[in-house]
Regions:
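Cysteine-centered metal-binding/redox modules
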Residues: 7, 11-14, 21-24, 30-207
Length: 207
């Protein structure tokens, strides 16, 4: 390719210029890679985290800026007295997870719940397509969404909405005796594609 830029330069006639091959990894490729590690009988946190780090590296500061702007736009439709809390939680635990994942080398390496992992594929692919913005070329928002859900569920073993997340009515995600409870979990129980089905929190009793 570079030789063709200087076809009349005799000094370049016998110059051996190596071919440069650029590999462009698309966000949707993550599902192919997830399927690959799913073929194993046992999947460790190290294997999954390595894959998540790989895809975090193709998320640029500009992608994070666009994702933050999108969440702020969606926040306009949240109740006014709940809006700032909503944005604080989602920006911190959604957008900022990318840096946390890249920096995370301190975790207990053990096998993840393979059955839940395998069952998550259709749900995650649905969410990926649902969150895609076709007006933005190679929109990374769906990728951030998927990475965050997998990281929180299988690496941290925490609910997708972090403890303390407040919902309208002053209801919150809670942890009691090592178990996680969400006040709105059952609202999505009939929606098989809801991300809540991946979340390990249980419905808060009595609500």
């Amino acid at each position: 390719m570079l030789k063709s830029l200087f076809p009349k330069n005799p000094k370049l006639k016998n110059l051996n210029i190596p071919t440069i091959k650029l590999t462009y990894m698309k966000a949707a490729n993550i599902f192919h890679d997830l399927r690959n590690i799913s073929s194993k009988d046992i999947i460790t946190k190290t294997e999954l985290l390595k894959l998540l780090k790989k895809y975090c590296k193709i998320i640029s500061p500009y992608d994070l800026m666009l994702a933050t702007a999108r969440m702020r736009e969606e926040g306009k439709y949240v109740q006014a007295n709940y809006r700032e809390k909503y944005l604080e939680v989602y920006v911190k635990y959604f957008i900022m997870r990318v840096k946390e994942i890249l920096d995370n080398n301190n975790y207990l390496d053990e096998a993840i719940d393979k059955e839940s992992f395998d069952e998550s594929f259709n749900l995650l692919k649905y969410q990926f397509e649902k969150e895609r913005n076709d007006s933005i070329e190679e929109d990374k928002f769906p990728l951030i969404y998927i990475i965050t859900a997998l990281y929180t569920t299988f690496i941290l073993e925490e609910p997708i909405h972090p403890v303390g997340t407040e919902f309208p009515g002053s209801l919150k995600v809670e942890e009691k005796n090592g178990e996680f409870y969400c006040p709105v979990k059952d609202k999505q129980k009939d929606n098989e594609n809801a991300i809540c089905n991946l979340c390990l929190a249980e419905q808060t009793p009595g609500i």
